[in-house]
């Protein structure tokens, strides 16, 4: 029986394994240490958090390290040309990107005369050095004025030409020979006029601006600066904020011309009573008119706000906003009448 069963052909064919087949029979030994170090550097590069400031630079460094180790492993221990060529290509690409990142982070050297303006006005608003250099390097000039020279003449100089910041010195603003306020270092010279030209073109200065000391100015071409700010939305918002703040400082110094340089820089003082009254008149005038830009122009031109608005027939009173009552402040300057003095004496007698 056993002989017959052994003579029968087997129904299951024998499996013949080709040594070139994909199924692994004998695993090769582990590769050299360089191979593992190369993969480790690639893995560390991909694990760097993106919140890190130098994330891209560290990533490129680790990728270049991994490619270099792969090149050494393929050349010295495996002798595989294709692996070596591909990693050389990857190494060159990463090196070019790494060099570009270093070039972008190079220190920008700002001119010594402009450094104080950048530190005081633009750096607190997160304007980078490269953007500030573009702003000051293309279409602006540094001009000098000697003591007594006029920057703008009343009713003569056009306001459409330039926008300037005072870098050094001190300037005086006057209207028809009457002193209005001073302009100190790191402040716009003609910010109110720049604001007014955005609404009305072809106007002239309504004040005279002259140098009280030897001055240095940073001047932009008005037209070219406007085109540049249209393409840089962030910088446009920065300029709007700086000019608005400068106009506010000029309003305070206009109401209190005795402000010193330190007081203008700090602007944390409480206005005096006279300053509060004049500011109250300005706010009443702006609250009782519908066109606040016209009121602002009239204020900055040096005229009396209340009288100019009363004489102007074009101003319309607002139905939604009422002027602020000034009765309490006006009582401070009123002299005592006989009736009030008698009432006061009666109350004192009763108290006694």
Curated annotation (Swiss-Prot):
InterPro entries: cNMP-bd_dom_sf, POPDC1-3, POPDC1-3_dom, RmlC-like_jellyroll. GO terms for cellular component: bicellular tight junction; caveola; lateral plasma membrane; membrane; plasma membrane; sarcolemma. GO terms for molecular function: cAMP binding; structural molecule activity. SUPFAM superfamilies: cAMP-binding domain-like. It is found in: Lateral cell membrane; Cell junction, Tight junction; Membrane; Cell membrane, Sarcolemma. The keyword Lipid metabolism does not apply. Residues 299-352 are annotated as: Disordered. The chain crosses the membrane at residues 39-59, 61-81, 83-103. Disruption phenotype: Morpholino knockdown of the protein causes cardiac edema in 70% of the injected morphants. They show malformed myotendinous junction and, in 80% of the morphants, skeletal muscle is characterized by myofibrillar misalignment and fiber detachment. It is a multi-pass membrane protein. Expressed in skeletal muscle (at protein level). Keywords: cAMP, cAMP-binding, Cell adhesion, Cell junction, Cell membrane, Developmental protein, Glycoprotein, Membrane, Nucleotide-binding, Tight junction, Transmembrane, Transmembrane helix. One of its GO terms (biological process) is response to ischemia. Glycans are attached at residues 3, 20. It holds the Pfam family POPDC1-3. Residues 60, 104-352 are cytoplasmic. Residues 306-321, 336-346 have a biased composition (Polar residues). Residues 1-38, 82 are extracellular. Belongs to the popeye family. Cell adhesion molecule involved in the establishment and/or maintenance of cell integrity. Involved in skeletal muscle and heart development as well as in the maintenance of heart function. May play a role in vamp3-mediated vesicular transport and recycling of receptor molecules. Involved in the formation and regulation of the tight junction (TJ) paracellular permeability barrier in epithelial cells. May induce primordial adhesive contact and aggregation of epithelial cells in a Ca(2+)-independent manner. May be involved in epithelial movement during corneal sheet formation and regeneration. This is Popeye domain-containing protein 1.
């Amino acid at each position: 029986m056993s002989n017959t069963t052994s003579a029968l052909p087997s129904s299951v064919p024998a499996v013949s394994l080709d040594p070139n087949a994909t199924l692994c029979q004998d695993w090769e030994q582990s590769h050299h240490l360089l191979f593992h170090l190369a993969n480790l550097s690639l893995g560390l590069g991909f694990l760097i958090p993106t919140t890190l400031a130098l994330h891209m630079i560290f990533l490129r460094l680790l990728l270049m390290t991994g490619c270099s180790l792969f090149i050494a492993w393929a050349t010295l221990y495996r002798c595989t040309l294709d692996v070596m060529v591909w990693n050389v290509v990857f190494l060159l690409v990463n090196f070019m990107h790494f060099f570009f990142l270093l070039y972008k982070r190079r220190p920008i050297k700002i001119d010594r005369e402009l450094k104080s303006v950048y530190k005081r006005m633009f750096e607190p608003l997160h304007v980078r050095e490269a953007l500030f250099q573009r702003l000051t390097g293309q279409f602006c000039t540094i001009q000098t004025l000697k003591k007594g020279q006029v920057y703008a003449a009343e009713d003569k100089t056009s306001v459409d030409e330039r926008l300037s910041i005072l870098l050094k010195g001190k300037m005086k603003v006057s209207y028809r020979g009457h002193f209005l306020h001073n302009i100190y270092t790191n402040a716009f010279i003609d910010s109110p006029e720049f604001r007014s030209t955005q609404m009305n073109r072809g106007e002239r200065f309504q004040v005279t601006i002259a140098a009280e000391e030897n001055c240095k100015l940073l001047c932009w071409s008005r037209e070219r600066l406007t085109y540049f700010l249209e393409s840089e939305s962030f910088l446009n918002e920065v300029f709007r904020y700086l000019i608005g703040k400068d106009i506010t400082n000029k309003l305070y110094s206009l109401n209190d011309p005795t402000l010193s340089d330190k007081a203008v820089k700090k602007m944390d003082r409480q206005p005096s009573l006279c300053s509060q009254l004049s500011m109250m008149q300005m706010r009443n005038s702006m609250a009782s008119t519908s066109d606040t830009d016209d009121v602002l122009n009239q204020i900055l031109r040096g005229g009396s706000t209340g009288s100019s608005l009363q004489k102007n027939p074009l101003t319309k009173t607002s139905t939604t906003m009422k002027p602020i009552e000034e009765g309490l402040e006006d009582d401070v300057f009123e002299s005592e009448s006989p009736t009030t003095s008698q009432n006061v004496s009666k109350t004192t007698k009763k108290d006694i």
